[in-house]
Amino acid sequence: MRPLADEIRPQTLDDVAGQKHLLGEGALLRRLIENGTDANLIFYGPSGTGKTTVANIIARQAKKALYTLNATTASLQDVKNVMADVDTMMAPNGILLYLDEIQYFNKKQQQSLLEFLENGKITLIASTTENPYFYIYNALLSRSTVFEFKPLSVEDTIPAVERGLRIEQERSQLPFTWEEDVPRTVAAGCGGDVRKAINAVELLYRSAKPKDGGLYVTRDDALQLSQCSAMRYDREGDDHYDLLSALHKSIRGSDPDAAVYLSLIHISEPTRH
């Protein structure tokens, strides 16, 4: 059985949750995609916000051969293997390379792409959860357009959660139902990460209580699972410094009970600062 997150992945721009600033009617990225762009793109934003989904939609519309690499595991040789197919029968119209987690490529690996981006033989779509202006080589940035994906609101996430619950309902051999507030509770607890919300739906189904010959999920079940959901945070990136800055300002303002301090405690940030 396919993972729920894979089965529920949107196939069209209209199905993508949130990101109306990028994909709404008349938005720049949507127009580029619908016009069949060959531009090099960098998608920047937190996990579970649709970067990979949108890249896959672009790839399906492209007439170029699609190659996918993940920079966490790919090597320079993997990049060279992709380049070797340029102008061959494998890629007569050029190559669309989707490079996930590009921040894990070092400068030399990123530089290896430049020659082929210059001559148009390769179109690059890269995604990163880190600030691209810190982690991506300047020459690569200058040849690409950066689009920022933002965490989803609760209202944007609820339809995806409801769809996931319905799919589990269709899959289930027993009647599967849930309390009315479950979708909102799951959506509110995922921190704007749709993938996390869908994974929560899977876990709720697997842990559903027997009731009247079927399976049943309560709001309390969803709330308990949401409390286990990690807060968005990075130890060295923007979130780290934004929270510390807010902490310092709350102290200067004689507000020792500020909620931001509680956030730092929750994610176990040392208070040595």
Q: Where does each model-flagged region fall?
A:
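Short conserved motifs of the RecA-like P-loop NTPase core
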Residues: 173-189, 243
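C-terminal helical "lid" of AAA+/P-loop NTPase domains
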Residues: 184-188, 195-209, 261
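Short glycine-rich substrate-engagement loop in P-loop NTPases that contacts/grips substrate
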Residues: 25, 67-95
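Conserved C-terminal helix/linker of AAA+ ATPases
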Residues: 208-229
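Pre-Walker A (pre-P-loop) alpha-helix and adjacent loop at the N terminus of AAA/AAA+ ATPase modules
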Residues: 2-40
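Conserved small/polar residues in nucleotide/adenosyl-binding loops
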Residues: 265-273
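Conserved AAA+ ATPase "SRH/arginine-finger" region at the nucleotide-binding site
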Residues: 146-158
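Walker A/P-loop
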Residues: 33-68, 114
